[in-house]
């Protein structure tokens, strides 16, 4: 998530509450957020370099670092590849430098938009003690066009997400 959390115009949900929303058709027309377009390989190389430098320092200081998912988890926004948009990307992250200090932030709404089984992802990261922070957010729609919803909207079974050890 090198630049921001991306949203387009808000939409209305239950009770006429205004909610944040995203439409990839609109967002793809936004200008570059940085000086140029970057490649996914460049972004991974830079991230790996940073993780290998910062994680040992975090270990020495007793700090745990958690990477936020790309929100929304689409391939490119503003000319920047969005690395953390899949289960495989997060697996790759924690393998760069295996350490208790190298972990993730688990945003349920964002992970539910990825093309992977969210419950399998939760189980995987819980077993490895890699989840530092959980955000309870529910969304309706698909990754390229969604809106945030109330947590109790049941697009995602929030109760089931607590059932992992």
Residue ranges and their predicted role:
Residues 15-17, 107, 130:
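Glycan-recognition surfaces
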Residues 28-37, 100-112, 139-149:
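Hydrophobic transmembrane alpha-helix bundles
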């Amino acid at each position: 998530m090198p630049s921001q959390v991306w949203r387009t115009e808000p939409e209305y949900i239950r009770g006429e509450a205004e909610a944040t929303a995203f439409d990839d058709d609109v967002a793809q027309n936004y200008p570059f957020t940085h000086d140029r377009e970057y490649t996914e390989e460049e972004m991974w190389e830079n991230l790996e370099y940073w993780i290998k430098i910062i994680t040992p320092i975090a270990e020495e200081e007793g700090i745990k670092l958690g990477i936020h998912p790309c929100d929304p988890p689409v391939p490119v926004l503003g000319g920047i590849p969005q690395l953390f948009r899949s289960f495989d990307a997060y697996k790759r992250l924690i393998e760069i430098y295996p350490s208790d200090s190298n972990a993730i932030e688990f945003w349920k709404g964002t992970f539910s938009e990825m093309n992977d089984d969210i419950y399998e992802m939760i189980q995987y990261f819980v077993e490895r003690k890699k989840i530092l922070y959980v955000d309870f957010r529910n969304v309706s729609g698909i990754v390229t066009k969604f809106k945030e919803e109330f947590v109790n909207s049941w697009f995602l079974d929030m109760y089931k997400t607590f059932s992992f050890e």
